[in-house]
Amino acid sequence: MKKNIIVTCLTVAFILCLCITVSVSARYRLDEKSYTQTATDTIIYQPSVNYKFSKATPNVIVDTDSSLYCFLEKLSHLRSLSNDSIKNVSVVHIGDSHIQADFFTGTARKLMNHYFGNPGRGLIAPNRLMKSNNGRHYKITSSKQWKHSFILKPNGIPIGITGLGLQTKDLTADINILTVDESFPGEWDFNKVTAYCDIDKTDVYLIQPNVINIDTITPFAMTFLLDTLTNNVDISFISPEKEISISGFHLSNGKRGVFYHSIGINGAKFCNYNQCSKDFYRQIASLNPDLVIISLGTNEAMVRAINADQLYSDISDFAYNIRHSSPNTNVIFTTPVETFARAGRKTSAIPNHKVGKVRDIIVNFAEKNGYPYWDLYNIAGGKGATLEWNKKKLFVRDRIHLTQRGYEYQGELLFEAIIKSYNQYIKANI
């Protein structure tokens, strides 16, 4: 009898653990029908872990002028299927190394796709080919050697939509793109590929699978429509001028949903993006962004003294460049989480309070110019919060970058803040 009771208890415990595991693993899984079932209702969401920080402020997007109205309206139409003309909503998140790693943006992407539909992986960058860290859920490989240029070190190689550019002097070059998600096979399959390259100087071919349509509506990109969904494609580039330049790719599957594109460059500042040519901003405009999220400021705080006037000017120039090329987009500024200070080439155990000064300048610009902002600096606990984040093991050893869990938590917080704004819109307008 006692043995049977033990077996029964173990069985129940196993079932409970299995249910919890399935629930957690399915948290970001897209059910193509689920996101339309409560189309005009608010969305209930909260981060998977509720970290407590002593001086944290409410997790909201400050939008006193209701600037996000158009973006939120499109989200509501997308979710309700009430407007057939709105098939996709496009978000472009621009930043530094915190964005390049894609744990932050990757989490926000998964959540947006879960609740509003998954139209594909969107923009991807060939970072590995320049020996830098890659984004999530894709691999780009090539048998050729590529020289590179990026916004911190431009050298004449054209810099494109991803903030970098690759170039080879060979007559031909090959690229393989593979999308991967071990948790959810097929999640990022695609049947449409856009290659960002100089199509005036380069012929582009897809070796497999079969192509049913080719589109060259822009001078800087070529789009291929495939006859089937796939997670693997080989692309061949041929140039009679022995100069092949590429900057990135765009993957989609033809379904409704939110594209969540990320553009991140390690070490980037506002001023680096301002040095980009007009082509960079034109190519961003080709993504038809409904919302641009700007997450910079960490590297601006890694200096001996902050020039407040210059930083304000850099922020203003960047905002102008985005709005000038994409006049119909909404823009959100975010503030950086406090990090630890540098001591020479090493990181000290002292919080870098200059991050707070950068935060103040970003917020000052946003408030004066009517831009919404997400004040992650204070949402994360404000001045001194670095010590709490470090105790919770949310920083890696350099105490400037976060652990994967730390970035995922930021992504959950950002999505929660967007959903709060979305729910306010729904209550006021539906």
Protein language model features and the residues they cover:
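A generic secondary-structure signal
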Residues: K74-H77, R282-Q283, N321, A417
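Conserved, compact domain cores that house catalytic/ligand-binding motifs in diverse enzymes
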Residues: K87-H93, Q100, F104, K255-T347, ...
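Membrane/wall-proximal cationic-aromatic binding patches
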Residues: I43-H93, N155-L164
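Conserved SGNH/GDSL esterase-like catalytic core that processes O-acyl groups on lipids
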Residues: Q100-K201, Y205-Q208, D215-S313, H401
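Catalytic His-Asp segment of secreted/periplasmic serine-dependent ester chemistry enzymes
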Residues: R27-Y28, S277, T339-I430
